[in-house]
């Protein structure tokens, strides 16, 4: 988790600078052996355990999409339960690290892409997007990403969303967090379950929610 504040310089908007800074920050963090301590930290392990439980709540997964893979800690847990899995991340290093970690898995499709522009003919029965959307530069960009993801969810499909709460995200310099995105998702999807994970540090919090798309 990080703070990324910036000002307008040489005619470049503050929002665009924030997006560029966030990208470089993610790239730099991913050079660490265990980025964000996703493999070693007890809070992250519990968060991933709950994310997996929510992901598997409807049984076997035919076609899943994971948005934002970091270094593959959650991908490694989810992949064995998916017949097909597409993993996208805007940072090439994230895809490269996770692909190396999962090199024995032939059923995964790896794509470097921005969640707002990613497009496919496929519909997914599960979409997982956690600790990703607050890196976008403004609420309009988050809404664009949400709309794009919902459009790729199959009828009766499920979305598992996770994020730090609004207050923490704003304290780190981001525009919005969990409550803002959950409100957007509730405009078009049905919220089925919500839970809150909290660790020992003030920075260790995550609101997780599972949504279902209507069949009509």
Swiss-Prot record:
Cited InterPro entries: NodS, SAM-dependent_MTases_sf, SAM-MeTfrase_NodS-like
Pfam families the UniProt entry points to: NodS
Keyword DNA-binding: no
Keywords: Methyltransferase, Nodulation, Plasmid, Transferase
Domain of life according to the entry: Bacteria
Biological role: SAM-utilizing methyltransferase involved in nod factor synthesis.
Classification via PANTHER family: METHYLTRANSFERASE (PTHR43464), TELLURITE METHYLTRANSFERASE (PTHR43464:SF49)
Name listed for the protein in its UniProt record: Nodulation protein S
């Amino acid at each position: 988790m990080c703070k990324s504040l910036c000002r307008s310089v040489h005619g470049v908007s503050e929002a665009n600078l924030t997006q560029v800074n966030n990208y470089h920050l993610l790239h730099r963090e991913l050079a660490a052996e265990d980025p964000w301590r996703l493999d070693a930290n007890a809070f992250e392990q519990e968060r991933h355990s709950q994310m997996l439980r929510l992901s598997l709540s409807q049984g076997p997964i035919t076609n899943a999409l994971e948005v934002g893979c970091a270094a593959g800690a959650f991908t490694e847990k989810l992949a064995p339960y998916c017949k097909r899995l597409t993993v996208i991340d805007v940072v090439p290093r994230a895809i490269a690290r996770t692909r190396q970690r999962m090199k024995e898995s032939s059923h995964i499709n790896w794509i470097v892409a921005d969640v707002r522009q990613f497009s496919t003919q496929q519909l997914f029965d599960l979409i997982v997007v956690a600790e990703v959307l607050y890196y976008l530069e403004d609420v309009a960009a988050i809404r664009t990403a949400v709309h794009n993801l919902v459009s790729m969810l199959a009828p009766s499909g499920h979305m598992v969303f996770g994020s730090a709460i609004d207050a923490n995200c704003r304290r780190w310099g981001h525009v919005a967090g969990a409550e803002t995105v959950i409100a957007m998702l509730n405009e078009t999807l049905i919220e089925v379950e919500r839970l809150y994970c909290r660790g020992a540090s003030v920075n260790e919090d995550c609101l997780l929610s599972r949504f279902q798309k209507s069949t009509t």
